[in-house]
């Protein structure tokens, strides 16, 4: 069984769920909720310690049915301090299905809305990190579906409290080994508390070696004792920024605005253009870059796609089509598609291969394909308008320090905005605000027509539905920065369409096309720049043609970095996006 396979449940005669992997029950036969409240909540000094920080961080080993988290959410909503936000990080190598969790949580109807919000946003089973919104609770959950040590090493947070709730050390000793407890210690803030139901000697020694002081307490139910642990020290309280100015109103800037507002920041978005790059087209693809290697780059795109689709689906009228067919372009593609479809980075069924005859019925084209059920076509204008909010339509010529914050000026030296923090998200148009960033402009022209339609398809080019017809394209011309629409580029797009979908191209021959040309920013390794500069400025650019896939997750990562709270992005993936990876002095600025 792979780490992402669901853990089989055996329902005992007494109604308790038991893991067939470890032979242990998921909660006490006396009362699982009462045990959670006594062992983990009270054991970590909750709710009293909620008042210590505006952003309170709880880590958990063993997500299981979500019972501990539902109980935590119930307590948090009743006792949270004004303006407080709860960040939860949990690890589960063998995730349960939503239906299994619902059957378990039904034992405690008193958890009510706390259990329901968790079930309504139940995380998937794909390997990696899952960001889960918990609306109405001022809380967010990051679930790591992977090995416990791998997850702890990947997480960049520091917990104020730990729920150590793996299966019994006698039945699952790997969860309690010294390496795990040392990693827990390394991911604990000064003054952190940890609690567990076991007082096994190996656990006590491991926690002590990890820097915790420990004490036995009276146990719950049939257990005579339980364990509480704490780290010495007091976590310093850093001054939190309250305002953020974002230069750039395309998908990068809009995603940053959404993430920042969700975190409680006041946001000003500034852009001198009415529509930015591909954000101004009537439709946009949300697809990952396919990587048969299954390494960090593949994991980045898989996680980004999952998060982007979750957010687009929550936005009214944003989604135009669900599922995108990627057609094979060469003899090796079917085998590559099969490898991608087998990757555990995607949810079961999200990637599946199609034989040539399977696509003929849909597209009149007998070509093997990869059906990407998790991909989308969206209406970019609706998304960027909703996420960015009101946009200040002025051009920023200069930004300068204003005490601890920033002051943005136009060409005449007039102040456009002031803010505590600054974000650069202008794509190719904002490249002049970064010193020697390795950004290269690429011009792309898309074409569209009314009254024709087709399933969303990619084939080197692409053809996707709009609200009124079909969009197809696009050209890809490096170092061309002109945005005039060209008739010859409509012809090029039609020729590309003919290679992938010849029957559709034949029907469109002789039609009149509308179009739009925009300039994207790209990097030498075709991965974006998503980092904080040494001066604290957010940089999100170089998204290329995958902006609608990448921007939502990367924006949340950058806002988390800005506020010094846990990021939804694993460490090894964030390292792919650093400004310094090209050995270029991009941490200096012309601002």
From Swiss-Prot:
UniProt xrefs under InterPro entries: FAD-dep_OxRdtase, FAD/NAD-bd_sf, MnmC-like_methylTransf, SAM-dependent_MTases_sf, tRNA_MAMT_biosynth_bifunc_MnmC, tRNA_MNMC2
User: Which SUPFAM superfamilies does UniProt cross-reference here?
Assistant: FAD-linked reductases, C-terminal domain (SSF54373), FAD/NAD(P)-binding domain (SSF51905), S-adenosyl-L-methionine-dependent methyltransferases (SSF53335)
Q: EC number(s) in its UniProt entry? A: 2.1.1.61, 1.5.-.-
Q: Which Gene3D superfamilies does the protein's record reference?
A: D-Amino Acid Oxidase, subunit A, domain 2 (3.30.9.10), FAD/NAD(P)-binding domain (3.50.50.60), Vaccinia Virus protein VP39 (3.40.50.150)
**Which keywords belong to this entry?**
Cytoplasm, FAD, Flavoprotein, Methyltransferase, Multifunctional enzyme, Oxidoreductase, S-adenosyl-L-methionine, Transferase, tRNA processing
Places the protein is found: Cytoplasm
Q: Name one GO biological process term.
A: methylation
Please give the residue ranges the record annotates as the region FAD-dependent cmnm(5)s(2)U34 oxidoreductase.
Answer: 247-591
Q: Where is this region: tRNA (mnm(5)s(2)U34)-methyltransferase?
A: 1-232
Name the predominant localization: cytoplasm
GO molecular function per UniProt: flavin adenine dinucleotide binding; oxidoreductase activity, acting on the CH-NH group of donors; tRNA (5-methylaminomethyl-2-thiouridylate)(34)-methyltransferase activity
> Which reactions fall under this protein's catalytic activity?
5-aminomethyl-2-thiouridine(34) in tRNA + S-adenosyl-L-methionine = 5-methylaminomethyl-2-thiouridine(34) in tRNA + S-adenosyl-L-homocysteine + H(+)
A single Gene Ontology CC term: cytoplasm
Does this entry carry the keyword Transferase?
Answer: yes
Required cofactor names: FAD
Keyword Cytoplasm belongs to the record: yes
Q: Which NCBIfam families match?
A: tRNA_MNMC2
Q: What does this protein do?
A: Catalyzes the last two steps in the biosynthesis of 5-methylaminomethyl-2-thiouridine (mnm(5)s(2)U) at the wobble position (U34) in tRNA. Catalyzes the FAD-dependent demodification of cmnm(5)s(2)U34 to nm(5)s(2)U34, followed by the transfer of a methyl group from S-adenosyl-L-methionine to nm(5)s(2)U34, to form mnm(5)s(2)U34.
Q: Which family does it belong to?
A: In the N-terminal section; belongs to the methyltransferase superfamily. tRNA (mnm(5)s(2)U34)-methyltransferase family.
Official protein name in the record: tRNA 5-methylaminomethyl-2-thiouridine biosynthesis bifunctional protein MnmC
Gene behind the chain = mnmC
